[in-house]
Amino acid sequence: MAFMEKPPAGKVLLDDTVPLTAAIEASQSLQSHTEYIIRVQRGISVENSWQIVRRYSDFDLLNNSLQIAGLSLPLPPKKLIGNMDREFIAERQKGLQNYLNVITTNHILSNCELVKKFLDPNNYSANYTEIALQQVSMFFRSEPKWEVVEPLKDIGWRIRKKYFLMKIKNQPKERLVLSWADLGPDKYLSDKDFQCLIKLLPSCLHPYIYRVTFATANESSALLIRMFNEKGTLKDLIYKAKPKDPFLKKYCNPKKIQGLELQQIKTYGRQILEVLKFLHDKGFPYGHLHASNVMLDGDTCRLLDLENSLLGLPSFYRSYFSQFRKINTLESVDVHCFGHLLYEMTYGRPPDSVPVDSFPPAPSMAVVAVLESTLSCEACKNGMPTISRLLQMPLFSDVLLTTSEKPQFKIPTKLKEALRIAKECIEKRLIEEQKQIHQHRRLTRAQSHHGSEEERKKRKILARKKSKRSALENSEEHSAKYSNSNNSAGSGASSPLTSPSSPTPPSTSGISALPPPPPPPPPPAAPLPPASTEAPAQLSSQAVNGMSRGALLSSIQNFQKGTLRKAKTCDHSAPKIG
């Protein structure tokens, strides 16, 4: 069934869970308003960044749209008079930067369509509700028994997954929910295997899996129909929310924070672990556990959205577990996500940050033990326990489950192999992303350490020591040159600089072989040496080049005339008479 066009070849499927960061680089004042130039970056790569230009009115419009979340966001107030003043603009820029920091670090806000469109209009300009409605309408042309009642706008967190309330024409009182989603970045199944597996989902029967009434797919999207549940999901129970309300309204800022009772935590936790173990044993990748993907049917939890991994959609908690290199399989991802879910069931809210350093008081220490094994620093660093290990822990081991429904989910061998290969590809991309994040964190830490106050002080001390050492060497060199100059001036032409190992140059006069007389005391201003001292000066230069300054200075100070050998000359200047 071709109810949606196939995406063009080479289309890049974005991972919507990769965080966006935003920094205001500059502001520019025009005639009546100020524009702020913002650098937006996707993930850790500086190359994957772009500039956007926004006015204060754009921020104000975004902030009004986000009011549904019930949060008090720090948008700087409006100012009608004096809003073009330079100091005011600089102060407002700081306030807007703080506002951007808040909305990009809030896990729910940062993933919502409003914020994505504000920061990345090129990739999020499409109206996905309209697109989904068009494709669903095309689908109904060949399946006339279904009818759309109304769109369930923004009830989920995914930007590219839309929901519609449905009914069957011959059963008008019965309500169903249709979900439509396009492909994600982790879709590695072939088109044929993908469509076969999607159509296989209605045959999956398990007491803790919410049944799929109808499912179909083509090369680029999938459409599934399930029964509508008035009670909603486990997250709706925890937050006391209405299932049809928008995601931001339901979960961003709950009015009352209260966890579940201990028996509920034990029972729901055991049921969820049992269905995860069932999927793992079947070789079916999941990786999408969170409280909104668990439907409540009486006192029974039933898992939703098995199609997500087939579509290649990224996990709700991906930005958390991508930070930890030991959480690198879909099984360990499910265990880590179970830790998040257990925390929400226990405390009525998600953890402020992960890993969790210390846990608040819980209804039982057995709860804390499971939380520590999945969310603590040690667990995130060393790795997750298995599902079987969690089932053996005291919190769940004594829970008795009573169900008469026998699990059924037959996957052909060929499709099992396709699932195995797809699972390996999903894990490979995760490992590569974790590696890049780890390298980036190390580099950032090194740069931060290099620029820290302590490091700057160390570098100043080293520079000071180097400067002192250089000054001392220059002083010694100057002293050696000064002594050299004094000795040369005092000895005149008849006393060249020598060392014990230096040969004595022969006399150029050719008259006397006697040693030179003692030099007179040096005058205040010594005259320049005559031309006859060129040979000693050259020898002195060679001596300086051949030995250290200290040895030369010592040689000069210890010089004794008595050590000079007498020179013998033969006078051949007299005329010969033959």
Curated annotation (Swiss-Prot):
Effect of residue 56 to A: Results in redistribution of protein from cytoplasm throughout entire cell
Pfam (any one): PX
Intracellular or extracellular location(s): Cytoplasm; Cell membrane
The UniProt record lists the keyword Membrane: yes
Keywords: Actin-binding, Cell membrane, Cytoplasm, Membrane
GO biological process entries: inflammatory response; modulation of chemical synaptic transmission; negative regulation of ATP-dependent activity; negative regulation of monoatomic ion transport
Gene Ontology cellular-component terms listed: centriolar satellite; cytoplasm; cytosol; nucleus; plasma membrane; protein-containing complex
SMART domains: PX
Ranges of compositional bias, category Basic and acidic residues: 568-578
Regions of compositional bias (Pro residues) in chain numbering: 514-530
Gene Ontology molecular functions: actin binding; phosphatidylinositol binding
Domain named Protein kinase: residues: 88-481
Residue span, WH2 domain: 548-567
PX domain boundaries: 14-126
Topology of this chain in the membrane: Peripheral membrane protein
Main subcellular localisation: cytoplasm
tRNA processing among keywords: no
UniProt cross-references to InterPro entries, sorted A to Z: Kinase-like_dom_sf, MONaKA_PX, Prot_kinase_dom, PX_dom, PX_dom_sf, SortingNexin/PXDomain-PKLike, WH2_dom
Tissue: Widely expressed in all tissues examined except in heart. Isoform 1 is expressed in high levels in the brain, skeletal muscle, spleen and testis. Isoform 7 expression has yet to be demonstrated.
Biased composition range(s): Low complexity: 483-513
Region span, Disordered: 437-548, 559-578
Protein family membership: Belongs to the protein kinase superfamily.
Comment, domains: The protein kinase domain is predicted to be catalytically inactive.
Role played: Binds to and modulates brain Na,K-ATPase subunits ATP1B1 and ATP1B3 and may thereby participate in the regulation of electrical excitability and synaptic transmission. May not display kinase activity.
Name this protein carries in UniProt: PX domain-containing protein kinase-like protein
Organism per entry: Homo sapiens
